[in-house]
Amino acid sequence: MKMTFRWFGEGYDSISLDKIRQIPGKPGIVSAIYDVPVGEVWPEEKIKKLKETVENAGLELEVIESVNVHEDIKLGLPSRDRYIENYQQTLRNLAKFGIKVVCYNFMPIFDWTRSDLAKVLPDGSTALSYEEEKVQKVDPNRMVEEVEANSNGFELPGWEPERLKTLKVLFEQYKSVDEEKLLKNLGYFLRAIIPVAEEVDIKMAIHPDDPPWSIFGLPRIVKSKESLEKIMALVDSPYNGITLCSGSLGANPDNDIPALIRYFGAKGRIHFGHVRNIKIHSLRNFDESSHLSSDGSLDMFEIMKAYHDIDFKGYIRPDHGRMIWGEVGRPGYGLYDRALGIAYLNGLWEAIGKMKKVC
């Protein structure tokens, strides 16, 4: 298991690499290029600069999150082939600089969705939160405005302004796209992408829908064991893999996260793990919590044990954290709570390994 930490890059993150380097275990960096429009080729010089910046700080960069998929690909429009060719070239460029895993998602229009970016928890910390009634009743344009107003001046991943300017047009286009068609469009994309991924030795890792159910009537196809099996079957290759996000899939209590890790891990399809906890209050209503098992609804010991049991060699990172100790930054991506998360997850990993030796 290789522990990592997401960093949004100079000018896009309130956290500096020298602070990340001080986290026990010195995690690897997960990052991306944020000033290239979705669908365009990532230039080699930008990738090189990012790689050198990370390495000059004494850290490693082997995982990219994310190379976003253009909406025309998800919609299956004739223009998708140009964007797919650009995606292929981006993979080739990334491979030249030692990138091993690319995380991506296939969620229509919106990436992760929350009703509150700074809900005050009983301990005084703030966290991302989801209330089904609020989300389904709010106008999508209003939600975009609220996200922009409450992001502390940062552009949030999956909520890039250039993608959301055409919201009305996108919703109209998606009226003719159901889950079956979206899955078909994903298959078209994967059949073009995976051969290139195999050629350049980059593992593709699809991220689950967050949350794992439909919002605003949009289709969702990455939400359960059954849906993940369908996606793996689209292209039967170890390079067609998964980012197993415990918080995303775990928002639905029907998803047994340790069982999913063992099932898809045994098939060699998990390349990246997002390990975080959530507190489920009722069906489709949850807050994000600290990583500690007792603070949420997921058993983090069992999750890490499942990874240990499959002898996981891929990458893991703590996911969204609370904002604690007065920190102000990108919602969900502060330093302190995620650093605590790394210490906790590393502690579980060490303890599990030593317990096995004793037993």
Swiss-Prot record:
Q: Which UniProt keywords apply?
A: Iron, Lyase, Manganese
Query: What is the enzyme's class at the highest EC level?
Result: lyase
Pathway where it operates = Carbohydrate metabolism; pentose and glucuronate interconversion
Q: Which domain of life is it from?
A: Bacteria
Requisite cofactors: Fe(2+); Mn(2+)
Query: Which reactions appear under catalytic activity for this entry?
Result: D-mannonate = 2-dehydro-3-deoxy-D-gluconate + H2O
Identify the Pfam families for this entry: UxuA
User: What is the name of this protein?
Assistant: Mannonate dehydratase
> What organism does the record attribute this protein to?
Moorella thermoacetica (strain ATCC 39073 / JCM 9320)
Phylogenetic lineage? Bacteria, Bacillati, Bacillota, Clostridia, Moorellales
Q: Which gene encodes it?
A: uxuA
